[in-house]
Amino acid sequence: MALSLAINVPPVRDNLLRPQPFQSQFRPNLLKFPIPSSARIRCSSSSSFNDISLKTVTPDNKNSFVCRFNATQLEVQETNQPYAETYAVGRHIRMSADKARRVVDQIRGRPYEASLMVLELMPYRACEAIIKIVFSAGANASHNLGLSKSSLFISKAEVNEGKTLKRVRARAQGRANQILKRTCHITITVRGLPDESDKEENSS
């Protein structure tokens, strides 16, 4: 004799069994194309954005700290005035070229005043010699060419190997080891615009 049992099973929802993706409450505001005409790209670069698929936008120059292109690294002149260059060289610096390059690489393309601040805060022995060369290059630009220090930037910074001093250190059993004392030559080139106050005095 067969028995049949009828059990009422509640329906199971599919959304309870399927794993739900993680949804964060912090969602970034993604940029959608095409850009509306009211949108603005905060950038202090004077170059126009030439893309057919996007609408032309006007740069916002009110905030100088957001999305600022470094024109010194891109070698772009933002003004029609010609730049002038001068340099300072430190020869036979008593340190290896590799130790000086790791410091020089941090100031290449930076403004003159910012480079001095960076060199004062870096904990390397090479900063003491490099900061003197940078300061000398800025003095040459201000005194010899009449450039404004606020417009100066490090356009070129090179470190080349100099002469190697060879010394001998006595070792055990009558032997001797050679000591190589490296030197380097550091060249700092600054570029800037003439001082406006000097122009007014010359014109008057």
Curated annotation (Swiss-Prot):
GO cellular component, one term: chloroplast
GO molecular function: rRNA binding; structural constituent of ribosome
Subcellular location: Plastid, Chloroplast
The keyword tRNA processing is assigned to this record: no
SUPFAM superfamilies noted in UniProt: Ribosomal protein L22
PROSITE patterns referenced in this protein's UniProt entry, alphabetically: RIBOSOMAL_L22 (PS00464)
InterPro entries registered for this protein in UniProt: Ribosomal_uL22 (IPR001063), Ribosomal_uL22_bac/chlpt-type (IPR005727), Ribosomal_uL22_bac/org-type (IPR047867), Ribosomal_uL22_CS (IPR018260), Ribosomal_uL22_sf (IPR036394)
Record keywords, A-Z: Chloroplast, Plastid, Ribonucleoprotein, Ribosomal protein, RNA-binding, rRNA-binding, Transit peptide
GO biological process, one term: translation
Family: Belongs to the universal ribosomal protein uL22 family.
Additional detail: In legumes L22 is not encoded in the chloroplast but by a nuclear gene.
This protein's name: Large ribosomal subunit protein uL22c
Organism: Pisum sativum
Highest classification ranks of the organism: Eukaryota, Viridiplantae, Streptophyta, Embryophyta, Tracheophyta
